[in-house]
Amino acid sequence: MSNMIVLIIFAAFIIYMIASYVYQQRIMKTLTEEEFRAGYRKAQLIDVREPNEFEGGHILGARNIPLSQLKQRKNEIRTDKPVYLYCQNSVRSGRAAQTLRKNGCTEIYNLKGGFKKWGGKIKAKK
């Protein structure tokens, strides 16, 4: 009986994770680095990594609004302009997109592979 409960909980968790991933893919468009470069200067560029990661290096022109603070700071992001998100490897940006969509953002883009795949200009704290 207890094995069955564990199996049901595990199956529910897997279904939740798949549903969350599918939803993220529907509400944000994942862009290649080339596509991302073509549009991010005309949009709001948000780095959702933590401050220590941001200070270690970030895309030139990005604002740091960590995922851990996004719900409290969501009003800093305009809903009438496109939002370009990135994190270290695209996991946190998907979760950030869900929060922003609930706040009214409709144009949300994500950097494929995240910052670790970025080959463009970066700024790092000295």
Curated annotation (Swiss-Prot):
The keyword Cell membrane applies. Gene3D superfamilies: Rhodanese-like domain (3.40.250.10). It is a single-pass membrane protein. One of its GO terms (cellular component) is plasma membrane. It is found in: Cell membrane. Keywords: Cell membrane, Membrane, Transmembrane, Transmembrane helix. The chain crosses the membrane at residues 3-23. Residues 39-123 form the Rhodanese domain. It comes from the Bacteria. Its main location: membrane. This is Uncharacterized protein YqhL. It comes from Bacillus subtilis (strain 168).
